[in-house]
Amino acid sequence: MSKWGHLAQTLTARKQQDLYRSRLTIDSPQAPRVMIEGREYLAFCSNDYLGLANDPRLIAAAQQALSEFGLGGGASHLVIGHHRAHHELELDLAEFTGRDRALLFSTGYMANLGVASALLGRGDYVIEDKLNHASLLDAGMLSGARLLRYRHADAEHLALRLDEVGDSRALVITDGVFSMDGDIAPLDAIAQVCHSKDAMLMVDDAHGFGVLGTEGGGCAAHFQMNQVQVPVLMGTLGKSYGAAGAFVAGSGELIETLVQFARTYIYTTSMPPAIAAAARVSLRISREETWRRERLNELVTRFRKEAIGMGYQLAASSTPIQPVFIGDAAAAMELSQALRKEGILITAIRPPTVPANTSRLRVTFSAAHTDDDLNQLLEVLHKYRGATNIAGVANA
């Protein structure tokens, strides 16, 4: 038997556990309604929170930049891949977030790995929320530092963890908005603990940037926290802002350290300049069109009231991420598939992405969703209320 025969066995086991992942291929732009294999579906599973992924103004900006800069970045930022569009976006992001400087990364995953590897090493500690995104946990494990975890959103437990590190350097990392639960980290309390214990705080605001704050400045803006209180701020441009890529914002010393030592920044090709140009327009739209966040709040408020009234168990979330807890992985998949037959796309989230017995439907809203869209979702959820097994779905 081949030494690699375990691959097939592992895949078979994953299927038997109802944890097998598969991809959908869409044939349309990202929007509330998408086309898959010739059928239109109403999607409540995108991270396009502000509804900008298919905005004609972003498309026009990208097209103009394509004619000016071409398509590819061509090289890493430190060789000849740092285009004017990148530089101007970094300036905009620094100003928007109230930080000295900002640095672009190709993805949020690479930004997180880059920060941890540049700031930490053997003898250091990285302390993370138990429910942090996988990229943050990977960043901690790969940094060379010792990884500790504290109870979810528990600043008191974080303080106890920091007491364990003694005089060693410690980087505390938390999501701003937790991607699978939608709740907001208590950044004010966490920042106070970090300050009192001389630890550096990093916030991954991938799902808060654009959604929270009057102009969409994210969790730091929501809590009115400056660069001293949140020294390392990471945000993404492919969710609320409808583009792609990510950034880290902070002091000049921090950013220059990343330029010199963050391997995921140094050893990769820059994002296409056209994406950076489109993201600049997206930032402006977010700041000016505050109705987009107001619309999200309207959708979330009504959804929560009516879904809870039907008997569904929701997470304690005020953000566009509204998980509907099912529990069993197979039951979550069955309900997701039943909704798809009704023309509604909602992804079933199962272990290991979430803890065992907490499988859920991850409902997400976009400012582009209409009242009729929400009505359709609620009607179908009403039909399947209480359906948590095969018989329940079949007989709903």
Swiss-Prot record:
The keyword Iron-sulfur does not apply. InterPro entries: Aminotrans_II_pyridoxalP_BS, Aminotransferase_I/II_large, AON_synthase_class-II, AONS_Archaea/Proteobacteria, AONS_Proteobacteria, PyrdxlP-dep_Trfase, PyrdxlP-dep_Trfase_major, PyrdxlP-dep_Trfase_small. The keyword Transferase applies. Its EC number is 2.3.1.47. One of its GO terms (molecular function) is pyridoxal phosphate binding. Pathway: Cofactor biosynthesis; biotin biosynthesis. Substrate binds at R21, H133, T353. GO terms for biological process: biotin biosynthetic process. Pyridoxal 5'-phosphate binds at G108, Y109, S179, H207, T236. The modification N6-(pyridoxal phosphate)lysine is found at K239. It comes from the Bacteria. It catalyses: 6-carboxyhexanoyl-[ACP] + L-alanine + H(+) = (8S)-8-amino-7-oxononanoate + holo-[ACP] + CO2. Its cofactor is pyridoxal 5'-phosphate. Keywords: Biotin biosynthesis, Pyridoxal phosphate, Transferase. Belongs to the class-II pyridoxal-phosphate-dependent aminotransferase family. BioF subfamily. Catalyzes the decarboxylative condensation of pimeloyl-[acyl-carrier protein] and L-alanine to produce 8-amino-7-oxononanoate (AON), [acyl-carrier protein], and carbon dioxide. Homodimer. This is 8-amino-7-oxononanoate synthase. It comes from Hahella chejuensis (strain KCTC 2396). The gene is bioF.
